[in-house]
């Protein structure tokens, strides 16, 4: 991937997909899917102390307007079809962050009959945030890692 270069007259010379990836990484609109106590930390990260808005991340109530879904809490088998339907309503490209031990692998309720044992069985997860519950700083770190992942050049496999 070619890095954008700024010329003397203020023109940015780059490929269109590179520019779109750069803009997309700095303008993530997220959908919160809080299922348990991790949602409290997610709300704290959006409050004034940490302020996810300064990273270009704006909460959205509709999946059709969101680029990212943050799954926080225990995902049950009964809730799995609902989250999959919400994910399918999101426009491409779409990203998933799994926040907390329960969303990552079931957490304390891993052996319960009603737990999906991780949202990666339902959705393709891009970033995992460990902890029970993870702190607001950990969520911000995960969001920044997702931004960095989008800015990275794609791997090209050639034979």
Curated annotation (Swiss-Prot):
NDH-1 is composed of 14 different subunits. Subunits NuoB, C, D, E, F, and G constitute the peripheral sector of the complex. PROSITE patterns: COMPLEX1_20K. It is found in: Cell inner membrane. Binds 1 [4Fe-4S] cluster. Transmembrane segments: none annotated. One of its GO terms (cellular component) is respiratory chain complex I. One of its GO terms (molecular function) is quinone binding. NDH-1 shuttles electrons from NADH, via FMN and iron-sulfur (Fe-S) centers, to quinones in the respiratory chain. Couples the redox reaction to proton translocation (for every two electrons transferred, four hydrogen ions are translocated across the cytoplasmic membrane), and thus conserves the redox energy in a proton gradient. This is NADH-quinone oxidoreductase subunit B 2. Its EC number is 7.1.1.-. Its main location: membrane. Its cofactor is [4Fe-4S] cluster.
